[in-house]
From Swiss-Prot:
The protein's Enzyme Commission number: 7.1.2.2
Family the UniProt entry places it in: Belongs to the ATPase alpha/beta chains family.
Location, primary (coarse class): membrane
Gene that this polypeptide is encoded by: atpD
Native source organism of the sequence: Salmonella paratyphi A (strain AKU_12601)
Molecular-function annotations in GO: ATP binding; ATP hydrolysis activity; proton-transporting ATP synthase activity, rotational mechanism
Keyword Transcription recorded: no
Compartments where located: Cell inner membrane
Protein topology in the membrane: Peripheral membrane protein
Name under which the protein is recorded: ATP synthase subunit beta
Length: 460
């Protein structure tokens, strides 16, 4: 095991000098004793002359030149398998929940090759989420990739928590949650929510929060993904939740300049597309098992053309776009039905009835969008009878797209609802065909199925 010495420390980037005949490989883990704590470094570049440039996986405070560094001669390895379920771990797979050792039987390196072309499988099976707007407008594929796009505070994390709860309870599958650079409070809320719903023993939690150094946030997504790959290779259908993929990109940006790379557009790292590709290509389904991934994507300044969200778009099967305008109307989940897309919304996959209903809902909402200017200037009375009907139905549809969440019961005071796809299609079809024209639009707000809206109307 070779030993080197620290020659330079700039923030999270540490240069280490090794003997010429024992230079560590790129992505090897190194270990240094920093006071009472062991700090892990990951080799990023070989600079020549025996010097390697590394990223620290923890705080580099207290490091000084001349400290001894050991080459562990393998990449960072984390525990995998059932022992990780119900536990909270950090980027190195060490437990941070005060419950003792993980007790794993196996450890895997976090850097792995993506499955080869012939191992991949293509599935057309739908994954029912119980959330009306998602199941109708942008259905998820089992083994597909979904992005939750939204600016600050429109509900990405709440939507993700609801998805985990619904899928864990209704489909009883294993999930891995990677918290990448998000708020520690959310991580804490999330753990307690999972415990209260009795699904914690089906979820592995890996956290690298906002206060962690960039090296930690850059690698924590890979730690979570490695745990998910193990479940997949055992022949299971596993869910991988990443909150937030933007912080993964941002961590790369933070260390990129320190590693001596020229910045590219908007100051992002020049290797943005490659870094994203390396992660996304591993999140895939094979003939043994599937990984269905849901990734929250923070959209800086609500600009979807920013390089980070734009690079993520290319890898997804379905996009759920959360809109600030819809959130400001008090409609939650604030999913934009006109902006959200899914490859699965195809009559050959979802069936003709589902497809026609979704497209019908979109055309009514689109027409309402066009009429809004006329209504704002001239008022409702100037519209034709046909347009008045479209507006009335559109407003009912808009309200019916809202739904009380289980994970938000504390805030809303109304019990959460899980709506089956069959009931969702029946409800929206009924509104479009005019079956519920006689009901007031308030009856459709924050209810589950259409039958609940009818019941609510009787009380109004």
């Amino acid at each position: 095991m070779a030993t080197g010495k620290i020659v330079q420390v700039i923030g999270a980037v540490v240069d280490v000098d090794f003997p010429q005949d024992a230079v560590p490989r790129v992505y090897d883990a190194l270990e240094v004793q920093n006071g009472n704590e062991k700090l892990v470094l990951e080799v990023q570049q070989q600079l020549g002359g025996g010097i390697v440039r590394t990223i620290a996986m923890g705080s580099s405070d207290g490091l000084r030149r001349g400290l001894d560094v050991k080459d562990l001669e393998h990449p960072i390895e984390v525990p995998v398998g059932k022992a990780t379920l119900g536990r909270i771990m950090n980027v190195l797979g060490e437990p941070v929940d005060m419950k003792g050792e993980i007790g794993e039987e196996e450890r895997w390196a976090i850097h792995r090759a993506a499955p080869s072309y012939e191992e991949l499988s293509n599935s057309q099976e739908l994954l029912e989420t119980g959330i009306k707007v998602i199941d109708l407008m942008c259905p998820f594929a089992k083994g597909g990739k979904v992005g939750l796009f939204g600016g600050a505070g429109v509900g990405k994390t709440v939507n993700m928590m609801e998805l985990i709860r619904n899928i864990a309870i209704e489909h009883s599958g294993y999930s891995v949650f990677a918290g990448v650079g998000e708020r520690t409070r959310e991580g804490n809320d999330f753990y307690h929510e999972m415990t209260d719903s009795n699904v914690i023993d089906k979820v592995s939690l890996v956290y690298g929060q906002m206060n962690e150094p960039p090296g930690n946030r850059l690698r924590v997504a890979l730690t979570g993904l490695t745990m998910a790959e193990k479940f997949r290779d055992e022949g299971r259908d596993v869910l991988l939740f990443v909150d937030n993929i933007y912080r993964y990109t941002l961590a790369g940006t933070e260390v990129s300049a320190l590693l001596g790379r020229m910045p590219s557009a908007v100051g992002y790292q020049p290797t943005l597309a490659e870094e994203m590709g390396v992660l996304q290509e591993r999140i895939t389904s094979t003939k043994t098992g599937s990984i269905t991934s849901v990734q929250a994507v923070y959209v800086p300044a609500d600009d979807l053309t920013d390089p980070s969200p734009a690079t993520t778009f290319a890898h997804l099967d379905a996009t759920v776009v959360l809109s600030r305008q819809i959130a400001s109307l008090g409609i939650y989940p604030a999913v934009d039905p006109l902006d959200s897309t899914s490859r699965q919304l195809d009559p050959l996959v979802v069936g003709q009835e589902h497809y026609d209903t979704a497209r019908g809902v979109q055309s009514i909402l689109q027409r309402y969008q066009e009429l809004k200017d006329i209504i704002a200037i001239l008022g409702m009375d100037e519209l034709s009878e046909e347009d008045k009907l479209v507006v009335a139905r559109a407003r009912k549809i808009q309200r019916f797209l809202s739904q009380p969440f289980f994970v938000a019961e504390v805030f809303t005071g109304s019990p959460g609802k899980y709506v089956s796809l069959k009931d969702t299609i029946r409800g929206f079809k009924g509104i479009m065909e005019g079956e519920y024209d006689h009901l007031p639009e308030q009856a459709f707000y924050m209810v589950g199925s259409i039958d609940e809206a009818v019941e609510k109307a009787k009380k109004l």
